[in-house]
Swiss-Prot record:
Top EC class of this enzyme: hydrolase
Organism: Rhizorhabdus wittichii (strain DSM 6014 / CCUG 31198 / JCM 15750 / NBRC 105917 / EY 4224 / RW1) (Sphingomonas wittichii)
One GO term (biological process): protein quality control for misfolded or incompletely synthesized proteins
PROSITE patterns assigned to the protein according to its UniProt record, in alphabetical order: PEPT_TRNA_HYDROL_2 (PS01196)
Main location: cytoplasm
Protein's UniProt name: Peptidyl-tRNA hydrolase
Subunit structure: Monomer.
Assigned GO CC terms: cytoplasm
Name of the gene: pth
Amino acid sequence: MQIWVGLGNPGAQYAMHRHNVGFMAVDTIAEVHRFDPWKKQFQGWSATGRIGNVKVLLLKPATFMNESGRSVGEAMRFFKRETGDVTVFHDELDLAPFKVKVKTGGGTAGHNGLRSTEAHIGNAFRRVRIGIGHPGHKDRVTGYVLGNYVKAELDPLAGMLGAIASEADWLASGDDARFMSEIALRLAD
């Protein structure tokens, strides 16, 4: 079993924040791949299903971003999984909007959800970095990531989330390069 975690903040008021794009990604995966309904579990919401022939637990921590690692660690221990079985979907300031990159390990780049996850499970987990762009100056970062997507961004956002979900088979099978290239091809059209 793989554990795929979407990072975000719980609550309707945060639903369309750029910082919640990880939640949006796993919600779209659950819908496209017809996962079981979400249930309250592991200090968050979880849904199980299959992507290809791989069993996947989707997880949305309800602990708020800064404590996400508590939820991830609890799920990992319950299923007796290793850090390498965890994939975290998160917003990435250092990528252009709607670009998607995958890497394993690395630093947190100041992302509190990643920092918390690393503190609880180590840093050898896979990250699906979802580009939100940078507002230009570090003083504007907090307002930007905690701001809603604007109307002009909604179509590209939906296209990117759909591509992530549609190409998730590659991610589940461990072909990160193919996952990224197939998403790029879909978004180039």
